[in-house]
Amino acid sequence: MVGSQVKSWFKNAFTYDTNKQSNTWDECLKADCFFVCLPTLYKENEGYDLSILEETIDNIPDGKLIVIRSTINPGTMDIFQNRYPKKKFMFNPEFLTELSAEEDFKHPDMQILGISKESSGMATEIMLMLPPAPEMRIVSLIDAEWVKKLRNAFYTTKVIFFNQIYDIIEKTELADYETIRSIVVHDPRIGNSHSFIKHKGYRGFGGACLPKDLYSLIDFAKKVGANSELLETVKKINKYLYK
């Protein structure tokens, strides 16, 4: 989802896409900075498939700045920076919805740029190239990775919370969920997003981002020996809601 939005913002940039008309790879190699927007498919208990990402990084010459926007686990960017010490890495997570991806990219609610020691000298320049946002932060690579992971995990939890409240209210047959919802979401600590019961005709959460980010976080927690009971419950409830 991310590549076309980046292309629309950087109108004079070289672009390379094996599935669409684009510049040649040799033309792209003239650039000093590469925004890498590639799919990282996720399989439960196996992790993200980083092969296409790693292949692309291998083909970018030393000394270049590489800004990754693909979805990955916390710690992945530090692994890349250590593996390729002569390249400079940044992580700029996407916060897009499928229905309004281009608008979300051009008018983000936050702009987060994760940097390494090797890329820190270009941090301000790159940040100013990106669409402005009310919250603009330059942080470590791993903190930027966690911001993306936390947001999406919270959204999944919020969806399930509102679905559970809906079911409880419906059982009473006295109160109106939509009236109640439309009032409480005016509390800025709660907000309107992810409070509607049906999305695209189904309950629960689906799509390309939320499920895989939740599942990957649960698997990540298991690997580091952390308790993820709440997240596992969210996953379990969603499996019977999402029909």
Name each region found by the language model.
Residues M1-C33:
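NAD(P)+-binding Rossmann beta1-loop-alpha1 motif at the extreme N-terminus of oxidoreductases
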Residues N12, Q81-M90, T97-S193, F220-N227, ...:
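Internal alpha-helical scaffold of NAD(P)-dependent oxidoreductase catalytic cores
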Residues L29-K30, D62, H107:
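Alpha-helix C-terminal capping/helix-to-coil transition sites in glycosyltransferase folds
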Residues C33, L41-A101:
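Rossmann-like NAD(P)(H) cofactor-binding subdomain of soluble oxidoreductases
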Residues C33-C37, I112:
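Structural motif
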